C-alpha cells in the first residue's frame, strides 16, 4: 500500500493541523469553557458519542448530513456481507445452498470494483438477501469473533429490503451505526447547562495515538470509551492482541500520564447491549483466564470495571464509570447529564465553592 493520501484524508489532516494550532494558541478561557477529550482504542464507540451530541445538543442531522451518510450505509452493508463471505472460505464453512456461490461472487465483485458506495441494483439486492438468508452464512456470522466484522452488520443486513429501496433515506439510527475510521482530531462544539463544551474525538487505531497527548494538557475531563464486547476479539491492526487487553493498556497509560494527573476521568464501558448478548455464549475467561465468576452480564461487567479501576495509581483521582450503549440516544442523554454534573461539581470544588 502506497503513501498517497486521498483527498478525504488530506482534508482530515489539514483540519487536524488547524485544530492543533488553535489548541496551542488558546487554552481554556474561563471555567464556563469545558474541554472534553474523547479517548479509547479503535471501534470503542467514540465517534458514535460525537454523533449523539449532535442529536441531543444541536439540531440533529441536516439534509446534507443524510445525503453524505447514504453512501456510507451502502458501503457498510455490502462490506459487512463481503467480510462474512470471505470468512466462509477461511473458516471452511459450506453454503446451505451451493447456488449462493454465484451470489457471493457478485457481492465480492462489486466491492473489488469499489462500487460499494452505490445504491444496490435490483439484481444485487436479491443476491444479498438470498445470501443473508443462507444457513451457512448465518453459521459464519455466529462465529464473527473469529474474524473482523462491523458491529452493525446484523442491523444493516436485517434491513436490506429497506436500505435497498429506490427511495431510501438513512434514518437517525442508520447514521448512528455507520462506521468510518476517524483520522486526526475532530472537534465538536455545543452548549449545555450554561457550559460551552468543546469535544475532541481522536483516532483510536494505534497509528493515530502519537497525535494525542501533547496538545491536551489543560483538558477539563477525559471520557475514555471501552467496547465491553471486545473481550473475545482481536485488534484490526494486530490480530495477536486481544481488544480488551489493548484497552486496559491504553487506559493505564492515559490514567497515569503526567499530563493528566489532575484530570477527571470518566469511563464509558460501552456496547453493553452487544456484551449482554455475547456473554451468554462466549465466556469471559477468553480474556481473563483467572475469572471464576458466573458468565452473567452483571458479574462479568463488574469484573471488567474493576480491572480498569485497578489501573489507577493515584489515590486522589476518582474514576467515574458508566455502562453505556452509544447507539441509544436516551441512554447517552442520561449519562451525559450525569457527566456534566460531575464536571460542574469538580469546577466548583476547584474554585473552593463546593
From Swiss-Prot:
<feature type="binding site">
    <location>
        <position position="325"/>
    </location>
    <ligand>
        <name>GTP</name>
    </ligand>
</feature>
<feature type="lipid moiety-binding region" description="N-myristoyl glycine">
    <location>
        <position position="2"/>
    </location>
</feature>
<dbReference type="InterPro" id="IPR011025">
    <property type="entry name" value="GproteinA_insert"/>
</dbReference>
<comment type="subunit">
    <text>G proteins are composed of 3 units; alpha, beta and gamma. The alpha chain contains the guanine nucleotide binding site. Forms a complex with GNB1 and GNG3. Interacts with RGS14. Interacts with RGS16. Interacts with RGS19. Interacts (when palmitoylated) with ADGRG3.</text>
</comment>
<feature type="modified residue" description="ADP-ribosylarginine; by cholera toxin">
    <location>
        <position position="179"/>
    </location>
</feature>
<feature type="domain" description="G-alpha">
    <location>
        <begin position="32"/>
        <end position="354"/>
    </location>
</feature>
<dbReference type="InterPro" id="IPR001019">
    <property type="entry name" value="Gprotein_alpha_su"/>
</dbReference>
<feature type="lipid moiety-binding region" description="S-palmitoyl cysteine">
    <location>
        <position position="351"/>
    </location>
</feature>
<dbReference type="GO" id="GO:0051430">
    <property type="term" value="F:corticotropin-releasing hormone receptor 1 binding"/>
</dbReference>
<dbReference type="GO" id="GO:0003924">
    <property type="term" value="F:GTPase activity"/>
</dbReference>
<keyword id="KW-0472">Membrane</keyword>
<keyword id="KW-0807">Transducer</keyword>
<dbReference type="GO" id="GO:0005834">
    <property type="term" value="C:heterotrimeric G-protein complex"/>
</dbReference>
<dbReference type="Pfam" id="PF00503">
    <property type="entry name" value="G-alpha"/>
</dbReference>
<feature type="binding site">
    <location>
        <position position="46"/>
    </location>
    <ligand>
        <name>GTP</name>
    </ligand>
</feature>
<dbReference type="GO" id="GO:0005525">
    <property type="term" value="F:GTP binding"/>
</dbReference>
<keyword id="KW-0013">ADP-ribosylation</keyword>
<dbReference type="GO" id="GO:0046872">
    <property type="term" value="F:metal ion binding"/>
</dbReference>
<dbReference type="GO" id="GO:0005737">
    <property type="term" value="C:cytoplasm"/>
</dbReference>
<dbReference type="GO" id="GO:0098982">
    <property type="term" value="C:GABA-ergic synapse"/>
</dbReference>
<dbReference type="GO" id="GO:0006936">
    <property type="term" value="P:muscle contraction"/>
</dbReference>
<comment type="function">
    <text>Guanine nucleotide-binding proteins (G proteins) function as transducers downstream of G protein-coupled receptors (GPCRs) in numerous signaling cascades. The alpha chain contains the guanine nucleotide binding site and alternates between an active, GTP-bound state and an inactive, GDP-bound state. Signaling by an activated GPCR promotes GDP release and GTP binding. The alpha subunit has a low GTPase activity that converts bound GTP to GDP, thereby terminating the signal. Both GDP release and GTP hydrolysis are modulated by numerous regulatory proteins.</text>
</comment>
<dbReference type="GO" id="GO:0099170">
    <property type="term" value="P:postsynaptic modulation of chemical synaptic transmission"/>
</dbReference>
<dbReference type="GO" id="GO:0006904">
    <property type="term" value="P:vesicle docking involved in exocytosis"/>
</dbReference>
<dbReference type="GO" id="GO:0030425">
    <property type="term" value="C:dendrite"/>
</dbReference>
<feature type="binding site">
    <location>
        <position position="176"/>
    </location>
    <ligand>
        <name>GTP</name>
    </ligand>
</feature>
<keyword id="KW-0342">GTP-binding</keyword>
<dbReference type="GO" id="GO:0031852">
    <property type="term" value="F:mu-type opioid receptor binding"/>
</dbReference>
<feature type="modified residue" description="5-glutamyl histamine">
    <location>
        <position position="205"/>
    </location>
</feature>
<feature type="region of interest" description="G1 motif">
    <location>
        <begin position="35"/>
        <end position="48"/>
    </location>
</feature>
<feature type="region of interest" description="G2 motif">
    <location>
        <begin position="174"/>
        <end position="182"/>
    </location>
</feature>
<dbReference type="GO" id="GO:0007188">
    <property type="term" value="P:adenylate cyclase-modulating G protein-coupled receptor signaling pathway"/>
</dbReference>
<feature type="binding site">
    <location>
        <position position="182"/>
    </location>
    <ligand>
        <name>Mg(2+)</name>
    </ligand>
</feature>
<feature type="binding site">
    <location>
        <position position="179"/>
    </location>
    <ligand>
        <name>GTP</name>
    </ligand>
</feature>
<feature type="binding site">
    <location>
        <position position="152"/>
    </location>
    <ligand>
        <name>GTP</name>
    </ligand>
</feature>
<keyword id="KW-0564">Palmitate</keyword>
<dbReference type="GO" id="GO:0042734">
    <property type="term" value="C:presynaptic membrane"/>
</dbReference>
<dbReference type="GO" id="GO:0098978">
    <property type="term" value="C:glutamatergic synapse"/>
</dbReference>
<keyword id="KW-0460">Magnesium</keyword>
<feature type="region of interest" description="G4 motif">
    <location>
        <begin position="266"/>
        <end position="273"/>
    </location>
</feature>
<feature type="binding site">
    <location>
        <position position="270"/>
    </location>
    <ligand>
        <name>GTP</name>
    </ligand>
</feature>
<keyword id="KW-1003">Cell membrane</keyword>
Amino acid at each position: 500500500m502506497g503513501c498517497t493520501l486521498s483527498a478525504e484524508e488530506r482534508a482530515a489532516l489539514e483540519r487536524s493541523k488547524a485544530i492543533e494550532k488553535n489548541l496551542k494558541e488558546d487554552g481554556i478561557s474561563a471555567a464556563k469553557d469545558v474541554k472534553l477529550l474523547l479517548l479509547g482504542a479503535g471501534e470503542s464507540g467514540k465517534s458514535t458519542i460525537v454523533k449523539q451530541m449532535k442529536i441531543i445538543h444541536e439540531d440533529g442531522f441536516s439534509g446534507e448530513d443524510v445525503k453524505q451518510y447514504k453512501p456510507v450505509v451502502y458501503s457498510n452493508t455490502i462490506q459487512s456481507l463481503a467480510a462474512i463471505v470471505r470468512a466462509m472460505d477461511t473458516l471452511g464453512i459450506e453454503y446451505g445452498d451451493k447456488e449462493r456461490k454465484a451470489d457471493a461472487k457478485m457481492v465480492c465483485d462489486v466491492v473489488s470494483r469499489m462500487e460499494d458506495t452505490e445504491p444496490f441494483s435490483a439484481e444485487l439486492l436479491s443476491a444479498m438477501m438470498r445470501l443473508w438468508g443462507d444457513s451457512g452464512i448465518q453459521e459464519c456470522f455466529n462465529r464473527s469473533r473469529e474474524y473482523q466484522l462491523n458491529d452493525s452488520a446484523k442491523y444493516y443486513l436485517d434491513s436490506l429490503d429497506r436500505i435497498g429501496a429506490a427511495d431510501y433515506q438513512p434514518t437517525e439510527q442508520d447514521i448512528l451505526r455507520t462506521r468510518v475510521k476517524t483520522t486526526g482530531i475532530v472537534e465538536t462544539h455545543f452548549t449545555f447547562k450554561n457550559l460551552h463544551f468543546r469535544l475532541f474525538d481522536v483516532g483510536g487505531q494505534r497509528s493515530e495515538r502519537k497525535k494525542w497527548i501533547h496538545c491536551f494538557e489543560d483538558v477539563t475531563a477525559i471520557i475514555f470509551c471501552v467496547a465491553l464486547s471486545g473481550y473475545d476479539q482481536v485488534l484490526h491492526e494486530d490480530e495477536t492482541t486481544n481488544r480488551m487487553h489493548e484497552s486496559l493498556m491504553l487506559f493505564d497509560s492515559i490514567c497515569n500520564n503526567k499530563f493528566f494527573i489532575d484530570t477527571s476521568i470518566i469511563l464509558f464501558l460501552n456496547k453493553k447491549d452487544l456484551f449482554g448478548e455475547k456473554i451468554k455464549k462466549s465466556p469471559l475467561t477468553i480474556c481473563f483466564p483467572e475469572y471464576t465468576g458466573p458468565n452473567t452480564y452483571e458479574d462479568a461487567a463488574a469484573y471488567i470495571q474493576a480491572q480498569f479501576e485497578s489501573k489507577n495509581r493515584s489515590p486522589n483521582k476518582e474514576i467515574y464509570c458508566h455502562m453505556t450503549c452509544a447507539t441509544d440516544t436516551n441512554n447517552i442523554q442520561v449519562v451525559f447529564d450525569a457527566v456534566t454534573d460531575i464536571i460542574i461539581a469538580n469546577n466548583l470544588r476547584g474554585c473552593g465553592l463546593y
